[in-house]
Each structure stands twice: as structure tokens, then as C-alpha cells.
């Protein structure tokens, strides 16, 4: 309790209205940091998915091109032998139409660079989030303790004794 009083004195939060405002401001900052972090994580996930789809497309494209050159029974036999590649190619093509409609295929190196930049941004955002969370937890704890001091709320130990 003394630590709470010292914290409130140092930060000039002895007035409950100021303390409530500080807690609310800290909660909003925490919420904004969390949303920013989630947005960056979603962007990373989207880029990684696009990279996988492009990789699948590029890996299976030679099989499709070789099939186009064949005809008759050779084409049928080739299709049956490489059916998994055809399925992967068609799925990748459908996803590419959704993820990058009417665009050229992005270079894998460009995607990797974008992912690395997003990961760096995510790390910075996480540091901001961690700082905001620690500040919020400290203020929320101070508020609970201050309310307990002012309103004389029984401590957990006293509540347990009363229950017995």
C-alpha cells in the first residue's frame, strides 16, 4: 500500500478523477497498440500465404506446360502420373486470381523483403504493446489499491477470515 501511495504521489495521481483518466488513457493506448499489432500480423500472414501460392504455381507450371505439348494417350497417361501437380496448380491459380487479380506474379525475393520489413515493424509494435501493457497494469493495480485504501474494502485475507 505504501508503494501505491508513493507511485500515486510521484505521478501526481492522488485525485481519483486524474487516476481514472490515466487508467482510461492507458487502456486506450493498450487497445490501439494491440490492434496495430494484429493488423501487422495479418499482413504478414497474407504475404506468407501469397508467397506459398506463388511458389506452388511456379513449381507446378512446368508440368502443365509439358502436358500441353502432349496429345492423345500420352497426355492422359501424363495427367494421371502428375495429377497431384495439376490439382495444386489449379488451386494456386484460383488463389492467385483472388489474391493478385490481373497482376503479374510478384517476385519471391520482393515478397521475402516485404515480409522481413513487416516482421521488423511487428517487433517494434510489440515493444510498444509491451510497454503500454505494463503501464496499464501498473495504473490498474494502483487504482485497485487506492480504492481499497479509500473505501476500506476488506483485503483477501480478511475476506477469507470472515468466510471461516
Feature names for model-found ranges:
Residues 1-164:
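Extended intrinsically disordered terminal tails
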Amino acid at each position: 500500500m505504501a508503494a501505491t501511495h508513493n507511485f500515486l504521489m510521484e505521478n501526481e495521481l492522488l485525485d481519483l478523477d486524474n487516476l481514472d483518466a490515466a487508467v482510461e488513457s492507458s487502456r486506450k493506448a493498450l487497445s490501439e497498440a494491440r490492434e496495430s499489432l494484429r493488423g501487422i500480423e495479418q499482413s504478414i500472414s497474407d504475404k506468407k500465404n501469397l508467397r506459398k501460392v506463388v511458389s506452388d504455381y511456379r513449381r507446378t507450371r512446368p508440368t502443365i506446360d509439358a502436358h500441353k505439348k502432349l496429345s492423345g494417350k500420352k497426355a492422359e497417361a501424363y495427367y494421371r502420373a502428375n495429377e497431384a501437380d495439376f490439382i495444386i496448380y489449379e488451386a494456386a491459380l484460383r488463389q492467385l486470381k483472388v489474391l493478385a487479380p490481373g497482376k503479374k506474379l510478384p517476385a519471391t525475393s520482393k515478397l521475402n523483403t516485404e515480409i522481413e520489413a513487416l516482421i521488423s515493424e511487428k517487433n517494434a509494435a510489440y515493444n510498444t504493446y509491451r510497454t503500454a501493457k505494463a503501464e496499464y497494469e501498473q495504473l490498474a493495480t494502483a487504482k485497485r489499491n487506492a480504492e481499497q485504501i479509500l473505501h476500506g474494502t476488506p483485503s483477501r485475507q480478511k475476506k477469507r477470515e470472515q468466510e471461516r
